[in-house]
Every structure is written in C-alpha cells, then in structure tokens.
Amino acid sequence: MKHVLLYCRSGFEKECAGEIQDKATQLEVFGFPRLKNNTGFVLFECYQAGEADKLIKEIDFQSLIFARQMLAVAVEIKDLPTDDRISPILEALSEKEGFPRCGDIRIETPDTNEAKELLKFCRKFTVPMRQAMRGKGLMTAKDNAKKPVLHLCFIAPGHCFVGYSYPTNNSQFFMGIPRLKFPSDAPSRSTLKLEEAFHVFIPRDEWDERLAPGMWGVDLGACPGGWTYQLVKRSMFVHCVDNGMMADSLMETGQIKHHMVDGFKFEPDRKNVTWIICDMVEKPARVAHLMGEWIIKGWAKEALFNLKLPMKGRYDEVLQDIENLKQFLIDNKVKFKMQAKHLYHDREEITVHIQSLSNISPY
C-alpha cells in the first residue's frame, strides 16, 4: 500500500497537500499529492510500497492542521456493479497482503455537496458490508475499538477508496466531522466553533477539570456572545471585551462583565483567568502575538483563538504564524502544548489552542 487519503474542507486541497508533503518529507518518505480543487480530499502517492502504513502510524494526526481524516488506501475501485457492490470489494481486499483485521467500519464521502448525495446510500450499505466483511474474517465478530477502522470513501456512484486508519491516530468522528447541534438560545452560530474546538483539543475525560464551573474566562471580540455562551453554559464567569453590544440573554445571567474597550489593550483587574478566547477579525500574526503575551504574562492558563487566513499563501501564513508563536513562548521559557486545526465550523480561518504547562505568576 502506497497511497494515503486525507479528507479536508472543499477548497483547501492545496493546503492539505502541502502539509502532507512536508510531513512525509520529514519522515524521509517521498512521493507526491494528487488533488483536484473543491473535491474535499487529497491522495498522497508514496514512491515505495508499504510506506502509506508508515505515514499513518508516524505522522501525528493531531499535528495536521488541514486534514480531517487520514487513512492508508488498499485499493481504489471504479465502476462497481449496481446489482452486487460487495463482491468486488471483498475480492479486491482478499488479494491485498498486509491489510489488517478491522474492528469498525465507516462508509463515508468527502464533504462536498455532490459527494454528500451518496450519504443515504452509504448508511444503507453499511450493515450488509459489515456483515460481509465479518463473514470473510476481514473484521472482528464484534466492534473492537482497539483494532484499525475500515474506511470506504465513495467519491462518486460506484467509485470508492477502501482503506484503514488507526484508532489511536485518527479522527474519532464520521467523515472527520463532529456532529453538533446549534443551541436555540445561543446568540450566533459562531458558538459551534468553540464547542467543536473543545471536542477536538480537550480530551473528554479532562473537561470537568479544565472547563470547570466557577472559572473565569476572557473573550476578546466577544459581541454578540457566541463564544461567551459556551463558557457561560459551563457555569463560568466571563470578561467580555468588545465595543459592540452583548446579547441580553447573556447579560441577564449575571455571569459576564462587559468591557467596551480595545481587545489589544484590555488587562484583567484580577489575575484569576483560566481561559482567554479570541475571535477578532485582525491580522493573524497580530492575534497570535497577543495570545502569546497573555500566556507568558501568566494572565491565562489556556488560550483558544482563531487566525484569519489571507486570500493567497494560506499555508505559508499559517506555518509562519505558528512557528513565530512557538518561538515567542520558547524564548520566554514557557513550557506548553499547542495544537492548530482547520475545524469543520471554520471557514477562512484556523483555530489554535495553547495550554501553558508552566506555573507563571501573573503578579
């Protein structure tokens, strides 16, 4: 197997391709990406057989910004007959040496309007395909979360990639997309960005500790309160910094303080802030530096923020801003964890998370 399939947002294939090319080169795996604009996926072809498995094992999936899912492709099948789609897939896999026995199956499509028309078929096809795979010993008799995940990705009727991912190094979500419901009482749809970020960046078993009731947060560029809403509903208190008006529903909770000042000049009176969150429409380098300052001063322990992307050179801008921010923290002797992701609810932006591991006094 020498192909790696990556899902991404439609229109960001170039950025996803540049990223997998860089990661593969760092591991001394050489190849090239195949892509078409607005298809929602990238296929990376390694020059050497067997190196696809190496990539999906050794590239830390959490380090990928633009990829929603990463899997090794065993076979690409075209022109599946409508009267029997299962047999050609079973036959193709039975001829593939080294294909692992899987514990789960996901029959998916790329995230495009055209491909998503196949989702109804994918849902209906999952049960018979799973039964057939188990019958041939290609899957465990019962779901096993410790075994690889079998993926069938249909990019057109009768045309699919068949491959696998490792559960310790993939997206846990179907199609790589968390399924979140918009809360009817939220002030704006931007609230889903922050909720998704919590799902992606914060392990669920750490939510009670790191997103605890009674914590204080600061929301820069808060108006009308989509991001603030996520903190308030977790019983946190929030300094909302924006010259615009906040939603009345949030003001009435008694959990927020509204500061009508410039987000770049705001400093909390009491240095008891755990979270700094920021969704300001500003140059990404400026926002990244500001978030770094909050962390190195000890004003916040964790930061979640968006970096707005330029029309051109998006991947280069992201690399530069992330690298500069990391170096800024290192130069100030801060120990930290950092992740960045182009989330499903992001558009022309990425979301970055920093967790400070240093005990920095804010005084």
From Swiss-Prot:
It holds the Pfam family RLMM_N. The keyword rRNA processing applies. GO terms for biological process: methylation; rRNA processing. The active site is at 308 (proton acceptor). It is found in: Cytoplasm. S-adenosyl-L-methionine binds at residues 190, 223-226, 242, 262, 279. Keywords: Cytoplasm, Methyltransferase, rRNA processing, S-adenosyl-L-methionine, Transferase. Its EC number is 2.1.1.186. GO terms for cellular component: cytoplasm. The keyword Ion transport does not apply. Gene3D superfamilies: 3.30.2300.20, 3.30.70.2810, Vaccinia Virus protein VP39. GO terms for molecular function: S-adenosylmethionine-dependent methyltransferase activity. InterPro entries: RlmM_FDX (IPR040739), RlmM_THUMP-like (IPR048646), RNA_MeTrfase_FtsJ_dom (IPR002877), rRNA_MeTrfase_M (IPR011224), SAM-dependent_MTases_sf (IPR029063). It catalyses: cytidine(2498) in 23S rRNA + S-adenosyl-L-methionine = 2'-O-methylcytidine(2498) in 23S rRNA + S-adenosyl-L-homocysteine + H(+). Monomer. Belongs to the class I-like SAM-binding methyltransferase superfamily. RNA methyltransferase RlmE family. RlmM subfamily. Catalyzes the 2'-O-methylation at nucleotide C2498 in 23S rRNA. This is Ribosomal RNA large subunit methyltransferase M. It comes from Vibrio atlanticus (strain LGP32) (Vibrio splendidus (strain Mel32)). The lineage of its organism: Bacteria, Pseudomonadati, Pseudomonadota, Gammaproteobacteria, Vibrionales.
